[in-house]
Amino acid sequence: MSSFAEARIDLDAISGNIALLAERAAGAQVMGVVKADGYGHGMVPAARAALAGGATWLGTAFIAEALQLRAAGIDAPILAWLVPPGEPLTEAIDAGIDLGIGSMWVINEVIDAARQARRQARIHLKVDTGLNRGGIGPADWSAAAAALARAEAAGLLTVTGVFSHLACADEPDNPATTAQLEAFHQALSVVDKAGLHPQVRHIANSAALLTRPDARFDLVRPGIATYGLSPIPGLDVPGLRPAMTLSATLVGCKRVRPGSGVSYGYRYVTDRETNLALVPLGYGDGVPRAATNRAPVFVAGRRRTIAGTVCMDQFVVDIGDDTVTPGDRAILFGPGDHGEPTAQDWADALDTISYEIVTRIGRRVPRVYTGAVR
């Protein structure tokens, strides 16, 4: 783990983002989604910050993540929505973790685990409304609801929630979202006819929370917006603040002649006499190799572009006639307050999404936390 590079995480920004999203949710509860190590920000600190900002639920992909939150002393409701075979269901039930049921086979697994735990399982039925990924499809909604109703009547589980996930919410005018919401209402009707009465119905991710009031239901699940990044490129959300700033101290700087090849494969060749600054971060830290000759970096008070191939541990920036000294700082991305690039700028440069940019920053880069909530 390096001391010369850091991902500085503003926990007050996370809390403030949740508070802002709660206002936009207009009465719906807010689930802070902290899967994938809190989108690279650190799961436990992000969870605490989200709760401090007004989240009443936490969301993870896997049971192991939820158990880590419990081990950290967090007792808020947690939903783990992706349950592969072999997961520690009994341990999850003992820990009071809500489980997402997205396949028919999982129902029997959870019932068996509840018997072993001698405790009611808390489950959320996931219905597939058109994403065609996880979730029980329309042909099996009635059978799933009936099976859950029988298990609930037997005292083995309680159906805490019903949920789904949207495919195209980041395209506000895409009719697929309306079609999925209509399908979700149909699924809720099936659940109601089976005699189930879930506490929370939820389908809205960050994009739907911000653009589709009809998708909010009882609970919303902001993911990327929790961390201050817009779920829709080009959509400005006043008040959202990016929480992560990725930076490193420069290792050195050298003057080179025109025509000098830079880094592996000489994919960048200088066209003049110039200064090259060396940044000690690379694809071993989550900086994509695809950032070669494409991604922006803030060095010596200006935005530059990575020059040459991104290596495992380092990359080069052409700074022209400007000068730097070892120990000066290069900022890869941050809130943009001082002219530095943002994670969205990186996403635009690499033809990807900001989610990937922040989530892929590796464990070799220490997280340094600021803010009142720790």
UniProtKB/Swiss-Prot annotation:
Pfam families: Ala_racemase_C, Ala_racemase_N. Gene3D superfamilies: Alanine racemase, Lyase, Ornithine Decarboxylase, Chain A, domain 1. Its cofactor is pyridoxal 5'-phosphate. CDD domains: PLPDE_III_AR (cd00430). The keyword S-adenosyl-L-methionine does not apply. Pathway: Amino-acid biosynthesis; D-alanine biosynthesis; D-alanine from L-alanine: step 1/1. InterPro entries: Ala_racemase, Ala_racemase/Decarboxylase_C, Ala_racemase_C, Ala_racemase_N, Ala_racemase_pyridoxalP-BS, PLP-binding_barrel. PROSITE patterns: ALANINE_RACEMASE. It comes from the Bacteria. The keyword Isomerase applies. One of its GO terms (molecular function) is alanine racemase activity. The modification N6-(pyridoxal phosphate)lysine is found at K35. GO terms for cellular component: cytosol. GO terms for biological process: D-alanine biosynthetic process; peptidoglycan biosynthetic process. It catalyses: L-alanine = D-alanine. Belongs to the alanine racemase family. This is Alanine racemase. It comes from Thermobifida fusca (strain YX).
